[in-house]
C-alpha cells in the first residue's frame, strides 16, 4: 500500500540527513527521491498527506511550491522558506 510506503519514507527521512538534504534542494522530486531510497509512493499520496495539514501547517512548511513536497517536509521536520530539517 502506498500510504504505508509514504509513512515508512517519512520515518526514514527523519533519521537520514542525506535524504533531508535531497529534499531541501530547490525543485526536489519527492517521488523520485523516495524511489531511489527504495520506496514506492505516488504524487496522489503526497497530495492526500498535504490535504490533512492545516493551513497554518502548510504555511509553516514552505512559502509556496508543491503541497505534496510541503507535506513530506513538514512531517519530516523541515520548516520555513529555507526548508531547514531537524536531525
From Swiss-Prot:
List the propeptide residues.
Answer: 1-64
Report what the protein is called.
Answer: Lantipeptide prochlorosin 3.3
Task: From the record heading this protein, give the residue positions of the covalent cross-link Beta-methyllanthionine (Cys-Thr).
Answer: 78-82
Function description: Lanthionine-containing peptide (lantipeptide) with unknown function. Does not show antibiotic activity against Lactococcus lactis 117 and Bacillus subtilis 6633 bacteria. Organisms that produce this peptide live in oligotrophic environments at very dilute concentrations, suggesting this peptide is not secreted to influence other bacteria.
- Post-translational modification remark: Cross-links are proved in vitro, when coepressed in E.coli with the ProcM lanthionine synthetase.
One Gene Ontology cellular component term attached to this UniProt record is:
extracellular region
Q: Which residues carry this modification: 2,3-didehydrobutyrine?
A: 67
Q: Which NCBIfam families match?
A: leader_Nif11 (TIGR03798)
- Asked if the record carries the keyword Protein biosynthesis, the reply is no
Task: Indicate the principal place this protein occupies in or around the cell.
Answer: secreted
Highest taxon, organism lineage: Bacteria
Source organism of this protein record:
Prochlorococcus marinus (strain MIT 9313)
Indicate whether Secreted appears among the record's keywords: yes
Keywords of the record, alphabetical order, are:
Secreted, Thioether bond
What is known about its induction?
Down-regulated under nitrogen starvation.
**Where in the cell does this protein reside?**
Secreted
Cross-link type Beta-methyllanthionine (Thr-Cys), placed at 75-85
Q: One Pfam family from the UniProt entry?
A: Nif11
Q: Which residues form a coiled coil?
A: none
Amino acid at each position: 500500500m502506498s500510504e504505508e510506503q509514504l509513512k515508512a519514507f517519512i520515518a526514514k527521512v527523519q533519521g537520514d540527513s542525506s535524504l533531508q538534504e535531497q529534499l531541501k534542494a530547490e525543485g526536489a522530486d519527492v517521488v523520485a527521491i523516495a524511489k531511489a531510497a527504495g520506496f514506492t509512493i505516488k504524487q496522489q499520496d503526497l497530495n492526500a498527506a498535504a490535504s490533512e495539514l492545516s493551513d497554518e501547517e502548510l504555511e509553516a512548511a514552505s512559502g509556496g511550491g508543491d503541497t505534496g513536497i510541503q507535506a513530506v517536509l513538514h512531517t519530516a521536520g523541515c520548516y520555513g522558506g529555507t526548508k531547514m530539517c531537524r536531525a
